[in-house]
Amino acid sequence: HVMSKESIEDVVRKSLEKYFKDLGEQLPSNVYDMVVLTVEKPIFEAVMARADGNQSQAAEILGINRNTLRKKLQQHGLL
């Protein structure tokens, strides 16, 4: 099953709509950081698995430099 950009967008949108609904009248805060941190970890997990743990290859797949990748892996407890 190939996941399209649109289906990823739909998942994020629906998840946020549910999150806002669950909050009720409470005003959400730091939504951007919450979403980025939540989405980043599985991206790095999947890409590192695809690259068989090779950080240089994973960085190339992601289009980021290896130092940035290492920083993000550490941030998410993946190193």
What name fits each language-model region?
Residues 2-7, 14-79:
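Bacterial C-terminal helix-turn-helix
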